[in-house]
Curated annotation (Swiss-Prot):
One of its GO terms (biological process) is translation. This is Large ribosomal subunit protein uL5. The keyword RNA-binding applies. Pfam families: Ribosomal_L5, Ribosomal_L5_C. NCBIfam families: PRK00010.1 (NF000585). GO terms for cellular component: ribonucleoprotein complex; ribosome. Belongs to the universal ribosomal protein uL5 family. One of its GO terms (molecular function) is rRNA binding. Part of the 50S ribosomal subunit; part of the 5S rRNA/L5/L18/L25 subcomplex. Contacts the 5S rRNA and the P site tRNA. Forms a bridge to the 30S subunit in the 70S ribosome.
Length: 179
């Protein structure tokens, strides 16, 4: 059973009861997933940007968008409009597919993994987790990468509070640490 079907058939009714909501449309749901990677070396090395775009497309199944500098910062040696990273916004079926692979395949492959930090909510029910290396995703092989790069994964929910967001992600299978 896919994560989307599991959400509709078992998770949503359970959350409706657990959170004491009256309407099924009040139940929090995952709106979108943002996968973001900042590349400091992209200003001087265009190959790293290309490799990063390909990796993001392989991991998410969707073409990555190049993010550009909004203004020049001399200390970082960047000018306005220079490529400084890439991002992918996932919605719908691709989002659920990515979440399922991230929770069930990628997270358990992290070395010394004891769960994700339960304090990484933003106050409005959205959750962000940083990944230190792209090798945790089974789609990326060690032989094909030029360097190890991390990324930020933000799960945007329709939850009104951190407690609702955490309840939703726990039901989806997110392994929170106990501390």
């Amino acid at each position: 059973m896919t994560l989307k079907n599991r959400y509709k058939e078992s998770i949503r009714p359970k959350l409706l009861k657990d959170l004491g909501l009256k309407n099924i449309h009040q139940v929090p749901k995952v709106v979108k997933v943002n996968v973001n990677r900042g590349l400091g070396e992209a200003a001087s090395n265009s190959k790293s940007l290309e490799a990063s775009l390909n990796e993001m497309a392989t991991i998410t199944g969707q073409k990555a968008l190049v993010t550009r500098a909004k203004k020049a910062i001399a200390g970082f040696k960047i000018r306005e409009g220079m490529p400084i990273g890439c991002t992918v916004t996932l919605r719908g079926d691709r989002m659920y597919s990515f979440l399922e692979r991230f929770i069930n395949l990628a997270l358990p492959r992290i070395r010394d993994f004891r769960g994700v930090n339960p304090k990484s909510f933003d106050g409005r029910g959205n959750y962000t987790v940083g990944v230190k290396e792209q090798l945790i995703f089974p789609e990326i092989s060690f032989d094909k990468i030029d360097s190890i790069r991390g990324m930020d994964i933000t799960i945007v929910t329709s939850a009104r509070s951190d407690q609702e967001g955490k309840a939703l992600l726990q039901e989806l299978g997110m392994p929170f640490s106990k501390n």
